[in-house]
């Protein structure tokens, strides 16, 4: 679904560059050119911009067989790639109408890299931030509300389950906000999360 792809691009680059195929009637000009200010994340910046102009879709076929080697940008200049990818994410936060502080951006990056453990205080801060993103999108309707909410809930679940060393307090925080807690979470996942606490 194009709206699901669009919502996902708010959080991370989900488009595998070598597999992109454009229709011939795509608008021309600067809107379909790489922005040189995003050196190692030019593709992500382009997709994040284009997704607001055209529909993206997936073809359910394997189009590329990837051979990974030690000289890929991902391996040789990962730091730069992350830095420019973060610039794209900041730009998308601004598109929602949020003038985010450095601390907000740092928290946003930490949430997206959800293998980090959160303190109880930063977990509460993350909940406030995610709720803020949800509310701004609900007002501006830039991303499909259903898909955007699902992704917000997904990240909320990930960061809560990565912080289970704080026991039942984390489970209470997770369930404490109905807008963030995932009602469609299977009983199996809820039980596993509960037992981890």
Regions found by a protein language model. Name each.
Residues 1-110:
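Conserved nucleotide-sugar donor-binding catalytic segment
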